[in-house]
Amino acid sequence: MNLHEYQAKQIFAQYGIPIPAGRVATSPEEASDAARALGGSLWVVKAQVHAGGRGKAGGVKLVQDLDGVRNAAAAMLGKRLVTRQTGVEGLPTTKVYVESGSSIAREIYLSLVLNRETSRITFIASAAGGMDIEEVAAKTPERIISVGVHPAAGLQGFQCRQLAFGLGLAGGQIDEFARLANALYRLYLERDASLVEVNPLIVTSEGRLVALDAKINIEENALFRQPEIAALRDPSQEDPVEREASEHDLNYVSLDGDIACMVNGAGLAMATMDLIKLHGRAPANFLDVGGGATSERVTEAFKLILSNRKVRAILVNIFGGIVRCDLIAEGIVNAVQQVGVKIPVVVRLEGTNADAARKTLAASGLAITPARDLTDAATKVVMLARGTSPRPSPASGRGRRDEHPRRQQDQGCLPGLHRQAGHVSFGAMSGLRHAAGRRRDARARRPETPRIACVRYGARCGG
């Protein structure tokens, strides 16, 4: 769950992290009154949306009089702010944050994230903070400092000094930075955060450290023990389809493709999406109906899928371990009849009562295309999305070796999913390939050398 800047700064203040004085406003008049109450002759008006890149998109304005505050707020409120992180539709601005201006001598980047490879909370810092930190990380990665914290030992003084020295701090700033770093670390742990970011952390002209911006993301699965933070959720900043999915216990993420996926299990869902990508199309969504999938949940899943008008075909891929395939088949038939599905549907069912499930689908008389395995399912749904008729599946066997998807793979882009174009280890990729039905060489005794694969859905990756 994401928090607005003003909400994150309220939490910062509770942990003694220095921030500029500021107030929230929902109208131009409130913004002007807030600036008057703050005093001074320099203010910053910031649009409150759950996205970065606001400064370059006109969502942050520096003004020097009350009329300027009012005009800046009027230009933001009620509008949709489009940044590099929002997509073309942007996010609605219902609040602005009016903050006292600060004298900036230097800008620093500082954040805490969980490094899943080392299983450690990790500080990431750079002396080149500010709006261009992504460019700095891409072009000059040597300017990024990373320090992992052992979960048993906790944050140590030498690690704080290591970060401070790397950021070029000196004198009393080192002790000040150590206090700030410890406060951020406690916040991260106690609030069940998945990200705490300060960009920029400024050094003022007086030499003080001040958090000029604040971003906090909270782990969704821990919200049950963070009721105060859960109450801060802003539904206007969330995808309405994803929000509706969560109300039905469905894990749904919108993507840019045109083939919808309905799968039980996150790993199988990722493998399914990979094969769609390998066969030349892109998935329209990530949808995990979970291990306890029911007929009702399948119906709701179809409704969510069909709310996306870009979808040209649907692939249902269910492995019945806990869930019974015959119940899922009944749910699919009911959903297709109830919702009125007008686009091709390909179904692959394996596991508990799979034979009975196939009979249910065949007896329904509906235009549902069965698939014998995952590769066959991906091939058929891609052909149907293109408007061509798939070849009927053979009665048995796994198909010719020439039909293996590896021959069609674009070697410039390894498959996988990370919602914000992150990094997935090669070991994880191997697991996905295995789940997707690829053969492993039984003679290979040594593991392959680990490497990193950059993964972007909807964009090509460099080799």
Language-model regions: role of each:
Residues 1-198, 202-316, 326, 337, ...:
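ATP-dependent carboxylate/acyl-activation modules
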Residues 110, 459-463:
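Rossmann-like NAD(P)-binding element
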Residues 321:
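Catalytic core of bacterial c-di-GMP phosphodiesterases, primarily the EAL and HD-GYP domains
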Residues 324-345:
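Amphipathic alpha-helical interaction surfaces in cytosolic regulatory modules
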Residues 391-394:
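Intrinsic, low-complexity polybasic segments
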Residues 396-399:
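A cross-taxon signal for low-complexity, glycine/charged-rich
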